[in-house]
A protein has these predicted regions:
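Bacterial Sec-dependent N-terminal signal peptides
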Residues: 1-23
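Short, conserved micro-motifs composed of acidic
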Residues: 21-302
Length: 302
């Protein structure tokens, strides 16, 4: 028995050492970038937010070892990834791209086994481009699956679906102008769809405290579903598109959304928000670059 206990102890120690070796050193987190304060700064200007490219929509994996983002090349958005391997960050690698279709708004499922995105690709990937749907590819041992899978009719409509994020239980938040008329085609609303028994359920629109007759899209929901941050185009905004935030009340209702103010918003266009899994940083896009700021800015708006 003593011998078995000793062997078991050695296994535990070895396993712990293995995990310690695979963790990212604190200084190397976030692509080795110096951390921001309460004022947003451009993220990785030497590697991601380049002057001659238009970058937007970004997400880190929960373990911090993968960074996905969209970049426009020759007028066509593509999705790239930078990974932490062998104690260093790799060069950006194209995950999915096309000369015919657009691919953007990457976001990982809560378990990291799926990479979701939007695309105007045809159903079989060969015909003419169509409206934007939400699609995903699945993680394999050596990378990602080759053929995108449509997220299905509970999510996608005859019109456009944009940008998605997830609660820890797998509920998807996204935006769509599905069901609108030609006169209200720009009226995108934020929706949610629970994930149950291997499929997404019928969507629900968020209340009028979030959705209006204006454009609301690019929604990030906190994993505990206690707040949403989204882009809206409203007359009272500071720019063409601003980030707004709505907190959930103690009774489970979404409170009236607030403009996140001049700390975040400018006369430009702010969109594609994302908060890192450690809760430390808010990422968002502005006029062709990716920015980040301390997530403490969220608490100042409660």
């Amino acid at each position: 028995m003593n011998r078995l206990r000793a062997v078991f102890a050695l296994m535990v120690i070895a396993t712990g050492s293995l995990f310690a070796q695979t963790a990212i050193p604190a200084a190397s987190m976030y692509l080795n970038q110096s951390r921001p304060g309460m004022t947003p700064k451009v993220f990785a200007p030497d590697r991601v937010s380049l002057k001659d490219h238009y970058e937007y929509g970004s997400v880190f994996s929960n373990d911090g070892k993968e960074f996905y983002y969209a970049v426009i090349i020759n007028s066509k958005p593509q999705i790239r990834c930078i990974r932490f391997e062998k104690n260093a960050w790799t060069a950006p690698k194209i995950i999915i791209a096309s000369e015919k279709y657009e691919y953007n708004d990457p976001f990982l499922s809560p378990d990291g086994k799926r990479l979701y995105f939007i695309s105007d690709r045809s159903a079989n990937g060969q015909g003419q481009k169509k409206d934007f749907d939400i699609w995903y590819i699945e993680r394999k041992q050596d990378g990602w699956s080759d053929v995108p899978i449509n997220a299905g009719p509970a999510i996608n409509s005859e019109k456009n679906e944009y940008y998605m994020s997830f609660t820890k239980n797998g509920t998807m938040y996204f935006s769509s102008n599905g069901g609108t008329s030609a006169a209200t085609d720009k009226n995108y609303d934020i929706r949610s769809s629970a994930y149950s028994k291997g499929k997404f359920q019928a969507f629900r629109k968020l209340s009028g405290n979030v959705n209006t007759e204006n454009y609301e899209a690019d929604v990030f929901v906190s994993p505990d579903e206690q707040y949403v941050i989204f882009c809206a185009e409203r007359p009272e905004g500071l720019g063409a598109g601003d980030l707004y935030i709505s907190f959930k009340s103690k009774t489970g209702e979404w409170q009236k959304a607030k403009n996140m103010g001049s700390i975040i918003n400018t006369g430009g266009y702010e969109f594609c928000p994302f908060v890192t899994s450690d809760g430390k940083y808010l990422f968002f896009s502005r006029d062709g670059d990716i920015f980040w700021v301390k997530a403490e800015v969220i608490e100042t708006l409660r």
